[in-house]
Amino acid sequence: MRILSWNVNGIQNPFNYFPWNKKNSYKEIFQELQADVICVQELKMQKDSFPQQYAVVEGFDSYFTFPKIRKGYSGVGFYVKKDVAIPVKAEEGITGILPVRGQKYSYSEAPEHEKIGFFPKDIDRKTANWIDSEGRCILLDFQMFILIGVYCPVNSGENRLEYRRAFYKALRERIERLIKEGNRKIILVGDVNILCNPIDTADQKDIIRESLIPSIMESRQWIRDLLLPSRLGLLLDIGRIQHPTRKGMFTCWNTRLNTRPTNYGTRIDYTLATPDLLPWVQDADIMAEVMGSDHCPVYLDLKEEYEGKKLSNFLSHSKEPPLLSTAHHSAYRPSKNIHSMFQHFNSMKKNKNNSPTQSENVSASASSGSSPTVSRANSVIDVDAYPPEKRRRKEQSKLLSFFAKQKEEKEETNKTEDVSIEVLDNNNESDIGLTVKKKVENGNAWKQIFSERAPPLCEGHKEPCKYLTVRKPGINYGRKFWICARPVGELIKNSNAVSEEDTQPFQCRFFIWDSDWRANSKD
C-alpha cells in the first residue's frame, strides 16, 4: 500500500508539465505514481468552483477541505483507492469546530460513530474557527491507523506568528491525545513547511538564520520536539530513517530562481508515523524526478504482509464512505447521463419554437388597440426575438449604413489631404526638408522610448540577466532588480574572472537594482 503526499501548488498545475500534459485525469497520474492513497496540498481553489474532473476520480473516493474566507489559497485533499480501503471516519480541521457535511452539528458535537475525537482542549470557539478557517488538515480513520494530511502555514516572519503558534500547538495536542488517550497509531503526511536539520537544506545560511531569527528557531524546535528520539517526541521521520545519511534529499525548490536543476532545495515534506507502525514499513522516499510543482511527491510504502498477517485484514472496508466524501456531495453526484441532457435540451428548444415571438406579441397588442410600452431599462431586445427574415433585413441595413458612413469619412479625409498637398506646394523646398528631418528625428526619439532595452550582462558570465520583483514585505517591496540568470548553487569564487574558462554552471553574485541600472545607462 503506497501513501503518497504531494504539494501540487494548484490542483490544475501538474497538467502544465510533461508528461502530465499528455494525461487526461488524475487517475492516470496516480497509476503512474503507483499510489493507493494520495494527499494533495495547496489546491488553490474554492469549494463552490472546484471542477468535477478533480473532485471525482474513477476508482477513488475523495475528501477535501477548503479555506473558508480567503480564495485561491491553501486547501488539502485525499484520494483513496476504493479497492484498497474505505475509511470508517473522516474529519476536516484539527479542532472539531467545523460542521459535519450535511448536518447541523460540528465534529466535536457529532455522535461517536461519526467522529475521530480527542480534540485539543481549552481552545475557545474564536481561536478554533481561526485555526481551521484555512483548509489545512484532514484526518481519515482506517481502523489500523489514523492518517493525517496537513499543509502547515509557511514561516513568513512575524506577520502570522500568532497563527502559526496556534496551529502548531493544536496539531501537536491532537496527535498527542490520539496516541496517549486514544491508543491510536498515527501516520502524518504533507507539507510541514519547516526544515528539521542542517542535512535538510542546501543553503547553509538557513542554519545561521535560525540563530538570528526567533520565529525560525521556534518553528524548527516545534518539529524537533515532535520527532523521536526527542524527549518530547511522538512520531518517527520515516523518510530519514530509511535514508539516514543521504544528502540532497530535498522536496522543494525555488522555481523563480530555477534552483531545481542544481538541486539547491530544502526538505519540508514529510512521511511521519508512530513507532508501532515501523515493522509494517517497506520503504519511504522522495520522487525528485517527478515534475508538476515546486515540490516533488514523497511516499510511504506499507508491506502487504507482516509475520503472516495481511495488511488488508487490518484496514477498514466500509460499505459507505464517511460524510466528508464527495460521494455525498450533490454537486458531484452523477444523477444524469448525456442522453437525458440532450433530451432536456431538445424539449427546451421545442417549447421555445412553440411560444409566440416578441414581434407577434407586439402585433397582437397593436391589433387589439393597445400600444406596447417599453421602459428604458428593458430597451435592449434579444436579436433572437426577431424573425429570421426581419433580422436579416435589420442586419443588412446596419451594414449598409456602416459602409456609407465609412465612405463619407474617406471622402472627407481625401479632401483634407488635397488641401495639405496644396499648402505644401506653396512652401519652398528647404522648409519641406526641415519638416521631414524633424519628423524623422521625432520618430527615432519615440522608437527609443518604446523599444525594449537589452538586459544587463552579469559580471561572472557576461550573459543576459534575469528580471525579478521583490515580493517579500518590507521597504523594498515591489522594487525591480536584475540577477544572474543561471540556476542557484555553489557560487563561483571570483565572480569577475570572466577570462577564465567557465566550468561553473551556477549563478554568480551579480545583482543590481533596476533603477540603478537605468540611471547608470543614461550616463
Curated annotation (Swiss-Prot):
Cellular compartment(s): Nucleus
Binding site for Zn(2+): C458, H461, C484, C508
Binding site for Mg(2+) 1: E42, D294
Family matches, as CDD domains: Ape2-like_AP-endo
Main location: nucleus
Active-site residue numbers: Y151, D191 (proton donor/acceptor)
Transmembrane segments: none
Cofactor note: Probably binds two magnesium or manganese ions per subunit.
Statement: the UniProt record of this protein carries the keyword Repeat: no
Catalytic reaction equation(s): Exonucleolytic cleavage in the 3'- to 5'-direction to yield nucleoside 5'-phosphates
Residues reported in the UniProt entry to bind Mg(2+) 2: D191, N193
Chain positions of site Interaction with DNA substrate: H295
Extent of Polar residues compositional bias: 353-362
Residue ranges covered by zinc fingers (GRF-type): 458-517
Entry GO CC: nucleus
Descriptive protein name: DNA-(apurinic or apyrimidinic site) endonuclease 2
Protein family: Belongs to the DNA repair enzymes AP/ExoA family.
Gene3D superfamilies the record matches: Endonuclease/exonuclease/phosphatase
Residues of the site described as Important for catalytic activity: D269
Function: DNA repair enzyme that cleaves apurinic/apyrimidinic (AP) sites and removes 3'-blocking groups present at single strand breaks of damaged DNA. Provides the majority of the AP-endonuclease (APE) activity. Repairs phleomycin D1-induced DNA damage. Plays a role in oxidative damage repair.
UniProt keywords, alphabetically: DNA damage, DNA repair, Hydrolase, Magnesium, Metal-binding, Nucleus, Zinc, Zinc-finger
GO molecular function, one term: phosphodiesterase I activity
Cofactor requirements of the protein: Mg(2+); Mn(2+)
Start and end residues of each stretch annotated as Disordered: 348-392
Keyword DNA repair recorded: yes
Position of the signal peptide: none
Gene behind this protein: apn2
